[in-house]
Regions:
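The feature marks proteins involved in alpha-glucan
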Residues: 1-90
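Substrate-binding/active-site clefts of carbohydrate-active enzymes
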Residues: 67-241
């Protein structure tokens, strides 16, 4: 079934609802359809042997946005990888490619950085992956799927997974441990796959029927619910592993 796209038709209280799979690990462009994936087929060469560098000395952490990190033409990155996951595989880049002032991971090495913290790289809802766009990514849509706008091919669900693995592998090879910024306290909108699959279970609702909005994003995930907590823990473990 690898590469097959699918969604669910759910009968809930007499209503037929179409939804993507909230547990999916791959999806199509813009995250509207889930994709069955054999994760072994997304492994770059040497992935099974890849390990993070050993923790040594002081932790010097550099937080970055995947697109911003390599988007500017002055960075000296090949055009087809600018703003994409594969940019992290480009070592020894320099300003305008002139070889004088380091950019990218070469610049991070010069700073003495040993941890790279990636701003959200799961699939989020505010950027049209078929066009050029920008957002920080704090609006999750598919929690267990990499963001497609950072991929060189957002239309084929396996590509974004492989390219993110390659990026992490390249960062490890260059001496960086990787931290992933995650957002489990709210979703892109209340019209989420979690809501469609089990209405009002995954969101915190007050006794008067109003939706909790402590996140100031229009909704709060109900992490106190047993299956919601399980979902979050399984998602974190999936990314970590």
């Amino acid at each position: 079934l690898h590469g097959v796209y699918y969604d669910f038709l759910l009968d809930i209280e007499g209503e037929r609802i179409q939804s993507a799979d909230p547990y999916a690990r791959a999806c199509g462009v813009n995250g509207t359809r889930s994709m069955a994936v054999d994760l072994r087929k997304t492994d770059p060469e040497g992935w099974e042997e890849d390990v993070a560098p050993q923790k040594e000395g002081e932790q010097i952490i550099y937080e970055l946005h995947v697109k911003e990190f390599s988007w500017d033409v002055s960075g000296g990155f090949p055009e087809h990888v600018r703003g994409k996951y594969p940019a992290f595989c480009c070592e020894n880049t320099s300003l305008y490619g002139e070889g004088t002032y380091p950019t990218g991971t070469a610049y991070l090495k010069q700073l003495g950085v040993n941890y790279v913290q990636l701003m959200p790289v799961y699939d989020y809802g505010s950027v049209d992956e078929t066009k050029d766009g920008f957002n920080w990514g704090y609006d999750p849509m598919n929690y267990n799927v990499p963001e497609g706008s950072y991929s060189t091919d957002p239309f084929h669900g396996e590509v974004r997974i492989r390219e993110l693995k390659e990026a992490i592998q390249a960062l490890h090879r260059q001496g960086f441990r990787v931290i992933m910024d995650v957002v489990y306290n709210h979703t892109y909108s209340l019209d989420s796959w979690l809501q469609k699959t089990m209405p009002w279970y995954f969101y915190r609702v007050w006794e008067d029927g109003s939706v909790s909005n402590g996140s100031a994003c229009g909704n709060d995930v109900a992490s106190e619910q047993a299956m919601c907590a399980k979902y979050i823990l399984e998602s974190v473990l999936y990314w970590a592993e």
